[in-house]
Amino acid sequence: MASQQNKHAFLSKNRIFHNPDNVSSSKSRNLMDITNTTNTMNGSRPSSMKSSLALPPVKDSFPSVSRSASLNINMSKIKDLKDRQDKIRFQRHTLRTQLIECEREIKTIKFRDLNKSRFELYKKKSKQAKYLKQVRDLTQNLNSKDGERADLIKKNKSALATLQAELDQNLILKRQESQELYNNKLIFWENELQIMENVEPDHEITEEISQLKKTLQELNINWANLQKQNLERQVNHESQLRKDFIAFKEAKLKSMENLTNKHRELLDQIATLQSESEKLHKEIMDIDRQAEYSEQNISEINENIKQLELANNPLISKSLQNSQDLEHLQNQMENLKEMASKQEKFYNDTYNTVEKELLRSRRLENSIIEQKGTMRCYAYVMEQNLPENLLFDYENGVITQGLSEHVYKFNRVIPHLKVSEDKFFTQEYSVYHDMCLNQKKNFNLISLSTTPHGSLRESLIKFLAEKDTIYQKQYVITLQFVFLSDDEFSQDMLLDYSHNDKDSIKLKFEKHSISLDSKLVIIENGLEDLPLNFSCDEHPNLPHSGMGIIKVQFFPRDSKSDGNNDPVPVDFYFIELNNLKSIEQFDKSIFKKESCETPIALVLKKLISDTKSFFLLNLNDSKNVNKLLTISEEVQTQLCKRKKKLT
């Protein structure tokens, strides 16, 4: 259908370009017709008609009425004719626009196919030339390899001839030497024998003769041994020469085999290149045929365009095709939706399994850390704010200083860029939290940083007090938040005012816990139960140098109280030290054991000695990072001391 429309547009465009005056004249005619129709619709008539109707006298009034009626009939017919002419002109105009569009499509298809076929033909010819060049190069290489092969054969033959000649010459020389030695000995002993025969026999001489005979026998034996040794040496030398000759022959045969294999490979390459050149030639012939076929198709398209000028059904067929395409696309969309739902289900299943495995591995890691000791030390790292000489090994939990190569060990080193505060509590910290709740042991989380880190506290409150969590379902949760200081006034952070009395926050040390005389909030509906001043930005950070304590008590919902005995809660303490002065006091009073009996020091000693401890070092300041790193070393030394005491 597209080809017929293109042909239709091609012929119509030629017609329009050859007769541009017709278009302008038709436009002017249309304008004139529109004015005429408007005049007739307004009821206006030509001036000649008006004058003709006004001229007759009163006497001839009857014939004038009949004449006006006939004129009205003629005007209505003229109006109908003009309406028909307008419709015909509109249809002609639409047909011309369709012909122009078809002609444009034909031109685009024609030039596109011809350019594409020419480009493919040029491409195939360039490939053929390239392959022919490769064939010529390979034939030259093959001829050169044949020459090298012939030279090697000649060299091998000449080398074999020289070796055989050397072997024959050595044998001849050895035989001549042995023959000369034998002749000399024979002449010597014949002379001696003649001398002895000429000498008159004597007793001493006879003895000497007998002695000489013995020596002769010994010499014969030695001579026979020498002959045997010479023969053995000759055999060994010949066998060695044969081995050398065989090895030389095998080496040369291997080189010959390699050359023959290369020759065969080159012949195979020539055959493949010839077959590819034949294929390319066939493809070129096919392209030529396709070009001829495309020309025939173009001629057929032109003929179909002529037929399309008479028929007015392409729009219907096109609409049917569009509806079919729409149905096909809708079916594809449904299939894609089904596939997407299946993939989403598969992804959710795999994600759940991965989460289960990660939770299992975290629990296993937590149990291993629990076996090592009661204190944990994690590093929460912001690399962009730290000096460049620190090297971080996240897998092994190690931080190394580049210059001194001093190593600081942690249970975990967590990057802030990959793990946010919310993810830290849900992924890394939750296993420790759940373990302490299940074991019903009081525990703490001590956050140490040289700069304020209020977002960590906010994430902790969300983790503990958010609605519809597992902790809300299993426990009744109470929360207290106070600020303690040795130098300034202490404050109850849940109240909307600050007390002026330094001793306004009273502490009481109990067995394995600390009670706070401050406002207590029961969290049942999530964060809505917290005071407004706690959720707003009135106190984003701690007021001044000191320590912030959040005490959270978990009362089990399913525990049954006997008589007056209340259910025993599990206490959790969040300690926040976010300035250098407080950290130095913490280091002196806890690890270096200096005499510092301040309230903050007593609270920290009580919590570290009677509850499970979790140290979180927030490394986010390049100036005072060494102080926190030394605290990590001291935590590790305290852990080793506790292990020794236990053993």
Curated annotation (Swiss-Prot):
Primary residence: cytoplasm
One biological process term in Gene Ontology: microtubule-based process
Skewed-composition ranges (Polar residues): 36-51
Cellular localisation: Cytoplasm, Cytoskeleton, Microtubule organizing center, Spindle pole body; Nucleus; Cytoplasm, Cytoskeleton
Coiled coil ranges: 202-350
Entry-linked InterPro entries: Vik1/Cik1_MT-bd (IPR031852)
Disordered as annotated region, ranges: 36-55
Phenotype of gene-disrupted mutants: Short metaphase spindles with splayed microtubules increasing spindle width.
A GO term, aspect molecular function: microtubule binding
Keyword annotations from UniProtKB, A to Z: Coiled coil, Cytoplasm, Cytoskeleton, Nucleus
This protein's name: Spindle pole body-associated protein VIK1
Organism for this UniProt entry: Saccharomyces cerevisiae (strain ATCC 204508 / S288c) (Baker's yeast)
